[in-house]
Amino acid sequence: MRIPFPVEPATFLERPNRFVIHARLHASGAQVRAHCPDPGRLRELLIAGATVYVNKADNPDRRTPYTLRFIEHPANGQLISLNTQLPNDLFAEGLTDGFFAPFVGYTKYKREVVLPHSAPIHPNQNQSKSVAIVPNHTNLRPSPALSKGVSSRIDFRLSTEDGAVCWVETKSATLVHDDGRAYFPDAPTLRGRRHVEELEYLALSGARAALVFIIQRPDAISIAPNRETDPDFADALGRARARGVELYAYTCGVTTSRVWLEREVPVMLNNANHKDTKTRRKNN
C-alpha cells in the first residue's frame, strides 16, 4: 500500500501525553508538535533522540500541525509504522489481492458494520444482508457491551457468492521483544477486550468470526496476548479462541513510502507453554 503523503525525518524529544509528541525537524531544526495516532505506551520506541517521520497536516489551524507516521527502532534502526488506521486498509487490500489463505472465497466485504445488540446474526429472507443481526440463543452468554444495549461496529463483514459470512476484527501491533515475539496490547484496552467478547458471542451463535493482528513491522516471529499489561484481554482472548474465534497474525514490510503485508506468523496464547494456537477454518 502506497503512503499517499510525503513524510520528513525528525528527532523525537518528548511525549507530553498519549496523543502528542514534540520533535525537531531535521531539515529546518524547528521544534514541532505532532499527533501520535498510536495510544500505546511505546516505551521501547519513543526514546529521546529516536528518529521519527512526520507529515504536515492539511489543516493549518490544527493544534498539532504534524502527524507521527513512522519511527526507527532506537536499538536497531528497524522502521515501524505507527498508523493505527492502516491495518484495516491493509486487510481490505489483502482481501482484494487474495493474500489471506483463510479467507479465500470471500469476494465481498463491508467495513464498519453496526452490530445491534438485539438482532440475530444471520439475515433472513426479509432482511438486508448488509444488516448485522444476533440470534436469540438461550444458552448464549452475551457480550457485556451487547447485553447493555450498546451498538458496536465490527471492522469487516465478509461474504462469499453463496452467502457465507465471516466477521473480522483487526488489531494493530507494534511491540516486539528482543526474542522476536510481538505482544498485544501495549496498554490496557477495554475497547479491545469488548471487541474480542463480541467475536466470541458471534462464534457461539454459529457465525464464523476471526481476529486478525496486523504487526506493522517485519521482524516478529509470533504474537501473544500481553498478559502483564492487560490480563483481562489475555483471558478474553483465551476464552474466545476456546469458543471458536479464529486467530491470525501477519507482519508487514515497511518503508516511508509503502507498507505491505508480508507473511503469516503464529498466534500463541500465554498458557500451555506458549503452545502454537494458530487456527485454520474448520471443515464443515
Residue ranges and their predicted role:
Residues A10, I154-D186, L199:
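Conserved catalytic cores of phosphodiester-cleaving nucleases, focusing on short active-site segments
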Residues Q216-N271, N284:
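Domain-level recognition of nuclease-like catalytic cores that cleave nucleotide substrates
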Residues F99-A119, N139-P142, L146-K148:
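A short acidic/basic microdomain associated with nuclease active sites
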Residues L46, N55-D97, A101:
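Terminal, basic amphipathic appendages of nucleotide-handling enzymes
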Residues K171, G180-R193, E197-T229, T251:
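Nucleic-acid nuclease catalytic cores
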Residues P120-G149, A272-N284:
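Short, low-complexity, charge-dense intrinsically disordered segments
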Residues N17-H22:
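Short aromatic-glycine-enriched beta-strand elements
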Residues G40-Y53:
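Short nucleic-acid-contacting surface segments enriched for D/E, G, S/T with interspersed K/R
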